[in-house]
């Protein structure tokens, strides 16, 4: 099994054309006798299962895309993102920033506000970055003596992340 992660970001430059090499690697007729030009040795790739990931298919050359079976995977729902944040991301970022459970609390409403008003993605990277930003600001409040314990809520989330970034389809803040 070989994972080709974010294949849509592969580019060509003066050093070579990666997509041409991938064409040879992914072609079932040619990959039995693939020649690795870097090491100068032949490699039999005929029994390898290739899995490629991409965020945007338009960045993949047509001939390369023709050698793949495209399986679209939908992003997380807002509810799934909430549970991922609650069960994993909050704890991870809290520990990363050296905060104890008693020093930092974030309620469900605040997490849901971050998801709906500060992120616009299928995954949770931006959600994690925003929770991390909240934690850093909590650290500053504690280190400056402004507060000993910080509870982040739906009502005060803008104090930590600023004005909402995203609106609903009607142009209204969600």
Predicted regions and their residues:
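Hydrophobic positions in the central parallel beta-sheet of the AAA+
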Residues: 2-3, 52
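Conserved catalytic/switch belt of AAA+ P-loop NTPases
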Residues: 6-44, 66
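Conserved AAA+ ATPase core "coupling" helix
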Residues: 49, 60-98
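C-terminal engagement/docking regions of AAA+ P-loop ATPases
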Residues: 125, 129-174
